[in-house]
Design a protein with these regions (language model features):
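Catalytic histidine neighborhood in serine/cysteine hydrolases
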Residues: 211, 215-233
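Short, surface-exposed "cap/lid" segments of acyl-processing enzymes
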Residues: 6-65
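Gly/Ala-rich beta-loop-alpha elbow adjacent to hydrolase catalytic centers
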Residues: 99-103, 107
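Conserved alpha/beta-hydrolase "acid-adjacent" motif
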Residues: 203-209
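Catalytic active-site module of serine/aspartate enzymes centered on a nucleophile-bearing elbow/loop
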Residues: 228-256
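Active-site nucleophile loop of the alpha/beta-hydrolase fold
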Residues: 122-132
Length: 256
């Protein structure tokens, strides 16, 4: 079923032009699988309040119905991010990419081929593999089962929703795993500084995702920050302020 009750105007691309000395610095924030811009927009608004130019796109197949996500090819997700990156380049000479969950995997994919255009990456509970599930297995499952129970809204803080789908499209999972397998093979090509936030208690993705990325990425400057009071969608959880402030410090440290 379609998403109901989401804030008006939030289930679409959002952007804001920066001001002052930070206006030339762009930040692109990408939501996760079955999620939507509401999971990243508060972060984007925080960074915009500090003068940065920000863009929070809606990935193809999201923000409408789960059935739409079953019709998307994985190449559409990095293509959307690259489009947004090019939009930022029109006014910004320094750009950071931020990704939550599959959004993290997507910005990593983009960084493997656009490394020189990116100043740094910030990842929150990024997805790079699905333990025990191969691309081939997910393909077979998707042929016989279109949907499964939702994996979204893994938030510790009561009364908070990420406004995502109430079901998991299995063909979409297959496409995501295809993208992530290719991304993982090329992680060594990513050499920009990386800040990675990881929830100690994550009911959606195992810690192996964080460990794989930190072990296989080509970046020498990589920092891991543990979140002890948030679940998977940490950008909306109790550690939100910690994420916001540390990301600001990371960006400021690379743009003196």
């Amino acid at each position: 079923m379609a998403i109901e009750g989401a804030p008006v105007g939030w289930m679409q691309d959002w952007s804001a032009v920066g001001s002052g000395k930070n206006a030339h610095i762009g930040v692109l924030l990408v939501h996760g699988f079955t999620g939507a811009p509401p999971s990243m927009r508060p972060w984007g608004e925080f960074l915009h309040s500090k003068g940065y130019t920000v863009r929070v796109p809606l990935l193809p197949g999201h923000g409408s119905t789960p059935e739409d996500l079953n019709e998307v090819k994985w190449q559409e997700w990095p293509a959307k991010v690259i489009h947004e990156l090019n939009e930022l380049k029109k006014t910004c000479d320094t750009i950071f990419l931020i990704g939550l969950s599959m959004g993290g995997g997507t910005v990593l994919n983009v960084a493997t081929t656009n490394n020189e255009e990116i100043k740094g990456l910030i990842l929150v509970n990024p997805w790079i593999h699905l333990k025990g599930v191969t691309v081939e297995v997910s393909f077979l499952v998707s042929r016989f089962r279109k949907m499964r129970a939702s994996v979204g809204n893994d938030i510790k803080r009561p009364g908070i929703t990420e406004w995502g789908y109430d079901a998991t499209p299995m063909r979409g999972v297959y496409q995501a795993l295809k993208m992530l397998r290719i991304t993982r093979k090329n992680l060594a090509a990513v050499t920009v500084p990386v800040q990675l936030f990881h929830s100690v208690e994550d009911h959606t993705l195992p810690v192996s995702n964080t460990e794989i990325i930190l072990a296989e990425i080509g970046s020498k400057d990589k920092t891991r920050i543990e979140l002890v009071n948030s679940y998977h969608v940490a950008t909306l959880d109790y550690d939100q302020e910690l994420i916001f402030q540390n990301s600001l410090t990371f960006i400021e440290g690379l743009t003196p």
